[in-house]
């Protein structure tokens, strides 16, 4: 269980480095690669991969049976996969949005957080109302991030720079709230 918490904190670190990279590299008037920006994106990648590995290991490494019934984890993952394919088709073919890795990142983050919340609920770490509230917040953050994703190429470069920061800030804040809820549940 501790691995899941550490993994989720590593995802906050990842969002922080990703935001730093974005702010450094895409600062108006034009994108410019820098050594500091390169370091930030490498650290985001490392902390993100480590966070995912630890979170998944934490969810898979729990001993004993869950104390409460939740959603099947594979159902959440399958829902995420279907959502990704539908959004990929909708955004690229119907709305003519250039496909970038951010769509996969948004959906992947949403699935990871919903699985983590489900796991903490099933194992008695979060009350049902807290898990549901946090899940609603995750879904709202994902929707807001998807709106930003869709708007990015339709606005000026300067506005796109700001809009591109929103999902990174939102996800970091949401993960911090979730992590604090898990800590508070222990007290």
Predicted regions and their residues:
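Interfacial loop-to-transmembrane junctions
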Residues: 149-172
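C-terminal ends of transmembrane helices
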Residues: 20-31, 85-96, 147-155
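Short alpha-helical packing/oligomerization segments
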Residues: 2-4, 63-65, 115-151
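Juxtamembrane boundary at the C-terminal end of a transmembrane helix
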Residues: 174-187
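Small-residue-rich segments of transmembrane alpha-helices in multi-pass membrane proteins
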Residues: 43-46, 102-116, 164-176
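Alpha-helical transmembrane-segment detector that highlights a single hydrophobic TM helix
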Residues: 54-88, 136
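N-terminal topogenic module of multi-pass integral membrane proteins
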Residues: 1-69
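Membrane-interfacial loop-to-transmembrane alpha-helix junctions, especially the N-terminal start
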Residues: 8, 29-45, 69-74, 95-106, ...
């Amino acid at each position: 269980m501790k691995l899941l918490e550490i993994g989720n904190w590593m995802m906050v670190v990842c969002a922080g480095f990703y935001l730093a990279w974005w702010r450094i590299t895409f600062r108006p008037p034009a994108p410019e690669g820098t050594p500091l920006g390169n370091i930030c994106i490498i650290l985001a990648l490392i902390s993100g991969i480590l966070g995912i590995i630890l979170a998944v290991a934490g969810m898979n490494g729990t001993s004993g049976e869950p104390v409460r019934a939740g959603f099947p984890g594979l159902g959440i993952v399958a829902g995420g996969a279907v959502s990704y394919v539908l959004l990929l088709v909708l955004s690229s073919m119907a709305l003519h949005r250039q496909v970038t890795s951010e769509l996969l990142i948004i959906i992947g983050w949403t699935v990871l957080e919903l699985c983590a919340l489900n796991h903490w609920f099933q194992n008695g770490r979060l009350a049902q109302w807290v898990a549901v509230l946090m899940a609603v917040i995750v879904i709202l953050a994902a929707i807001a991030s998807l709106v930003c994703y869709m708007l990015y190429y339709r606005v000026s470069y300067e506005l796109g720079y700001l809009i591109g920061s929103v999902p990174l800030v939102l996800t970091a804040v949401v993960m911090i709230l979730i992590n604090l809820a898990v800590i508070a549940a222990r007290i």
